[in-house]
A protein has these predicted regions:
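C-terminal motif of bacterial Sec signal peptides marking the signal peptidase cleavage site
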Residues: 6-9
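Sec-dependent N-terminal signal peptides
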Residues: 1-2
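Surface-exposed loop and turn segments in beta-propeller and other repeat-based domains
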Residues: 98-110, 150-164, 195, 200-220, ...
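Repeat-solenoid scaffold signature
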Residues: 214-241
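Short edge-strand/loop segments of extracellular domains
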Residues: 136, 233, 240-244, 248-254
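Short, charged low-complexity linker/loop segments at the C-terminal edge of domains
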Residues: 15, 207-208, 254-255, 361-369
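C-terminal amphipathic alpha-helical segment
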Residues: 242-245, 266-283
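Acidic, Gly/Ser/Thr-rich repeat motifs that build Ca2+-stabilized beta-propeller blades
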Residues: 11-184, 232-238, 275-306, 313-317, ...
């Protein structure tokens, strides 16, 4: 059992616009395709000018590898630092972040640590947060109230110095979906008795078990999960030595890592260098956005009724903020983004790492629509 140290309070400068009632995590907001800016106007998603040259896309600075991200009902965000276990409250008005607590006992070797977060679908009643993290023994999922004790929900997920996965999301069915990695041993992804290289479906009210929880298999490193407007589950797969993938995730299907066959499911998108290193995904209406660590950009395209890419793959924020990790759309259609420039690979700026909130993300555009 992991203990938690309560450390923080609240911001004096941010007033929530309640009352709020949390709803199960479900379809994303519908965001209209961006319009071309008028002459002299700023393009959507580009850094806007702030007071005395400040960048109003940036809502938090001075963080350390923020990877977990969950949006609270009051419009603020919980941000989890991969290599410290700190959970911060970040405010959309760029008030100073507040340190709320620390998850101890992390193993941050390689890409391990605090890797993903999700709010309980009944957060207004139980105040629970779920986290995917690496310990000395395994990767596991825990649940806790802010300032409380972390209790294991699902343990025994294989760990490694690389490819630890960490994606978490609640589906419209109330189940918790978790993306795992192959831990650097690709053959494990095809082993139906091993939890590595899989997407898991976990009944948080039942008795979670081992292989019975496998939803999909044949993945390298599932770094992000996101939902379409109809509740369809999508995931990103970070792959060494091959294009990264965006997949439509279908129960009991195999996704071809490390060896594709006639029965494996093809990705809907493949991202080659230099735009690869996928870290996050989000859907708005008929369009999908995926962030890139190595590529230092956000890719976006429109999907058709069969979830195939129907428009040109475009990009924004290219090299503007460095390595981009987690994505979430809030109720106002703004896109929250975390940077990972202090992960030992990036070249951090003095104010890294940062959390961004893009008010008019250019997600959408040409291509076929979904009926």
């Amino acid at each position: 059992m992991l203990g938690i140290l309560l450390l923080g309070g609240c911001s004096d400068s941010y007033t929530a616009a309640g009352p709020w009632v949390i709803k199960p995590e479900g379809p994303p907001p519908v965001v209209a395709p961006p319009q071309d800016p008028a002459p002299g106007q700023q393009a959507p998603g580009e850094p806007p000018p702030g007071a005395e040259g400040e960048d109003s896309n940036v809502v938090a600075t001075g963080l350390s590898v923020p990877t977990g991200l969950a949006l609270l009902p009051d419009g603020t965000a919980l941000v989890g630092e991969r290599n410290t276990g700190r959970i911060m409250q970040v405010f959309p008005d760029a008030a100073p972040p507040v340190e709320l607590m620390v998850l101890p006992g992390l193993d941050t070797t390689g890409d391990g640590g605090l890797l993903g977060m999700a709010l309980s679908p009944t957060y207004d009643q139980d105040r629970l947060v779920y986290a995917y993290l690496t310990t000395a023994e395994d990767n596991r999922i825990v649940k806790f109230p802010i300032g409380g004790t972390a209790n294991p929900v699902f343990t025994g997920i294989p760990k490694g110095t690389t490819h630890n996965g960490g994606a978490l999301i609640f589906g419209p069915d109330g189940a918790l979906y978790a993306g795992t990695g192959d831990t650097g041993e690709p053959d494990l992804a095809e082993d139906e008795q091993n939890l590595a290289g899989k997407v898991l479906r976990i009944d948080i009210f039942g008795e979670p078990s081992g292989p019975e929880s496998i939803y999909t298999s044949g993945h390298s490193d599932v770094t992000a999960l996101c939902l379409g407007p109809d509740g369809q589950l999508f995931g990103t797969d970070l792959i060494d030595g091959a294009p990264d993938e965006v997949n439509v995730l279908l129960e009991n299907e195999e996704y071809g890592w490390p060896q594709a066959s006639s029965g494996t499911i093809d990705p809907i998108l493949e991202i080659d260098p230099p735009g690869d290193g996928l870290g996050g995904c989000a859907l708005a209406g008929e369009s999908i956005a995926v962030s890139a660590l190595d590529g230092q950009r956000i890719h976006t395209t429109q999907l058709d009724a069969e979830y195939a890419a129907a428009g040109e793959l475009t990009e924004f924020l290219t090299t503007t903020y460095g390595r981009l990790r987690t994505l979430l759309l809030d109720a106002e259609g703004a896109l929250w983004v975390t940077t990972n420039n202090r992960d030992g690979i990036g070249a951090p700026a003095p104010d890294d790492d940062r959390v961004l909130r893009i008010l008019s993300p250019p997600i959408g555009g040409g291509g076929g629509g979904r009926s």
